[in-house]
Amino acid sequence: VPLNTVMLARGSSSRPEPLERMLAAGAAGLKIHEDVGANATALDMALRVADAHDVQVCLHTDGLNEGLLVEDTLRVIDGRTIHAFHIEGTGGGHAPDVMRLAGEPNILTSSTNPTFPFGLNTAAEHAAMVELVHVLRADLPGDAQLARDRVRPATMAAEDVLHDLGLIHMTTSDSQGMGRIGETLRRTMQLASVMRDARGAAGDDDNDRVLRYLAKATINPAIAHGIAHDVGSLEVGKLADIVLWEPG
């Protein structure tokens, strides 16, 4: 079955050659992740290589703030364009202030679907999820504290509003425990409905808000990753994203 899929290569390297080899092999972008190094050297190198090859860097920032604080990350990025993952209340990244990355003119932002819309059991679910995905033991004080620090309910609630204000540009599934690939569009539309009830209608009808939220899962990611000429919207000349048929 044909799929509109691009692959991201591991972006954590102090030298350009490994990154360039992966791009030459067909990778469409680079991914920096805290689990294998979201330090200053790796981040700067990935951005240098990405600029040279006109691809995107996706960033999962340093959640333990061991190598970089959020201010340090902004300093290393130095105005270059980047896609920051997990602009949300869990999932990883600078704790507790990863939301600081939202609103920067050069930073494209996304959040993963398990955190929105924020509900009664959202925070409780994520503590168990973090422990499972990162192989933590709840009976070890250090592991338990790490899981608690990664789940920030107030930030999760703020995430919904930041989406409605347009400060978070994309909705994603991520992978493994943090993401649910089959729920991205459904949760995106649920969030639009919740925000309409919470913040009021955007006009005489809901069309504007619906289109803005639809863009978070379609054209915005396509633009962010340089593939909007092929996918992301229904236009002449693009690959088909939808098929209409009349059941017999």
Where are these regions (language model features)?
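Metal-cofactor-binding active-site regions of metalloenzymes
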Residues: 1-17, 34-35, 228
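Alpha-helix-loop-beta-strand connector modules within alpha/beta enzyme cores
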Residues: 1-3, 49-59
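Residue-level detector of anion-binding/catalytic polar loops
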Residues: 4, 28, 55-56, 108, ...
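Flexible, glycine/charged-enriched surface loops at secondary-structure junctions
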Residues: 4-6, 58-60, 200-202, 231-233
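Divalent metal-coordination and catalytic microenvironments
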Residues: 5, 11, 30, 60, ...
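Active-site neighborhoods of metal-dependent hydrolases
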Residues: 17-39, 63-74, 79-213, 225
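Alpha-helical segments flanking ligand/cofactor-binding loops in enzyme cores
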Residues: 20, 44-48, 160, 235
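Acidic, glycine-enriched loop/beta-strand segments at the rims
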Residues: 214, 222-248
